[in-house]
Amino acid sequence: MIPGEVIPKAGEIELNAGAPQVVLEVSNTGDRPIQVGSHYHFYETNGALSFDREKARGMRLDIAAGTAVRFEPGQAREVRLVPLSGARKVFGFQQKIMGDL
């Protein structure tokens, strides 16, 4: 082994295996691009994103950690969400929850 070397497991890795999923149509009604990171509480994203927010409560994007999805002005796309895991408490973001989900 070489210091810092990464040896990936053979085969494919399934993200969020077995997690319940919600698919939502999301559109950017604003005039600026909006980028949402992998672990951002989707319910609390920028108000210019139009979607069913109640279905997104307690959810995050079903994408690899450290990545993001970008919504260009006027763009609509489907996104797949999975539940936030762990203690199921949300603090910060836009301060709309500040506690238990």
Swiss-Prot record:
Protein name according to UniProt: Urease subunit beta
Subunit description: Heterotrimer of UreA (gamma), UreB (beta) and UreC (alpha) subunits. Three heterotrimers associate to form the active enzyme.
Location in or out of the cell: Cytoplasm
Keyword set includes Cytoplasm: yes
Pathway(s) this gene product operates in, as recorded in its UniProt entry: Nitrogen metabolism; urea degradation; CO(2) and NH(3) from urea (urease route): step 1/1
Any one GO MF annotation of this record: urease activity
Organism: Chelativorans sp. (strain BNC1)
Record-level GO cellular component terms: urease complex
Catalytic activity: urea + 2 H2O + H(+) = hydrogencarbonate + 2 NH4(+)
Lineage: Bacteria, Pseudomonadati, Pseudomonadota, Alphaproteobacteria, Hyphomicrobiales
